[in-house]
């Protein structure tokens, strides 16, 4: 599914303020990772990254490419490609708990200041 900024802001409201990360920071980071498209798959340094949050198959989810995956989220990577973001959010929070927001490389250079453009006026 291709989300808009406002659709995604609505769905991800529960992430606002989690571990000190604001919703606009998430919206910006997701935009730079996946362009708000749940079908995103990126091959990167021998890993494959899935979905809005670019969750990878080396640490967080399992697919049939890398054996063994640590599979910290205990889930198939393909679950991050569907329209239900519940499991994506759960795994992204685990990722954040473990690694911090700068684990998403777009965050620090692109999403740590001047965040007004990432707010949804409709909320």
UniProtKB/Swiss-Prot annotation:
Record keywords, A-Z: Calcium, Disulfide bond, Lactose biosynthesis, Metal-binding, Milk protein, Secreted
Biological processes, Gene Ontology terms: defense response to Gram-negative bacterium; defense response to Gram-positive bacterium; lactose biosynthetic process
Gene3D superfamilies: 1.10.530.10
CDD domains associated with the record: LYZ_LA (cd16898)
Residue span(s) of domain C-type lysozyme: 1-123
Entry's localization field: Secreted
Entry keyword Transcription: no
Disulfide bonds: 6-120, 28-111, 61-77, 73-91
Tissues expressing the protein: Mammary gland specific. Secreted in milk.
Molecular function as annotated in GO: calcium ion binding; lactose synthase activity; lysozyme activity
GO cellular component terms, semicolon-separated: extracellular region
UniProt keyword Disulfide bond, yes or no: yes
Binding site for Ca(2+): 79, 82, 84, 87-88
Quaternary assembly: Lactose synthase (LS) is a heterodimer of a catalytic component, beta1,4-galactosyltransferase (beta4Gal-T1) and a regulatory component, alpha-lactalbumin (LA).
Function: Regulatory subunit of lactose synthase, changes the substrate specificity of galactosyltransferase in the mammary gland making glucose a good acceptor substrate for this enzyme. This enables LS to synthesize lactose, the major carbohydrate component of milk. In other tissues, galactosyltransferase transfers galactose onto the N-acetylglucosamine of the oligosaccharide chains in glycoproteins.
Family (UniProt): Belongs to the glycosyl hydrolase 22 family.
Protein name stated in the entry: Alpha-lactalbumin B/C
Gene source species: Equus caballus (Horse)
């Amino acid at each position: 599914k291709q989300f808009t900024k406002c659709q995604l802001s609505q769905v991800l409201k529960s992430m606002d303020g989690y571990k000190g990360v604001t919703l606009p920071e998430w919206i910006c980071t997701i935009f730079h990772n996946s362009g708000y498209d749940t079908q995103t798959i990126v091959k990167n340094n021998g890993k494959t990254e899935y979905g809005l949050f670019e969750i990878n198959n080396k640490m967080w989810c399992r697919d049939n490419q890398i054996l063994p995956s640590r599979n910290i989220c205990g889930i198939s990577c393909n679950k991050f490609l569907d329209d239900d973001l519940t499991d994506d959010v759960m795994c992204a929070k685990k990722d954040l708990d473990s690694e911090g927001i700068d684990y998403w490389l777009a965050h620090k250079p692109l999403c740590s200041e001047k965040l007004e453009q990432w707010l949804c006026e409709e909320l």
